[in-house]
Amino acid sequence: MDDKVETGNIDVRLLELLVCPLTKGPLEYDAERSELVSRKARLAYPVRGGIPIMLPSEARSLTE
């Protein structure tokens, strides 16, 4: 069984361990935008080359 999420090649086991660096809350993977989303912080962290960039300065603010 393949433990990779199709888009972005994110390891599912890694996603289960990662939390938002600001809130320590859970993250959701948005495959369409290749981002990890923290609903609590209202931020989306980019995933580049399969590597999550967990820096608040690199995150996109969610204005929705």
Swiss-Prot record:
Gene Ontology cellular-component annotations: cytosol
Lineage: superkingdom: Bacteria
PANTHER family registered for this protein in UniProt: PROTEIN PREY, MITOCHONDRIAL (PTHR33505:SF4), ZGC:162634 (PTHR33505)
Family the entry assigns: Belongs to the UPF0434 family.
Protein name: UPF0434 protein BCAN_B0909
Organism: Brucella canis (strain ATCC 23365 / NCTC 10854 / RM-666)
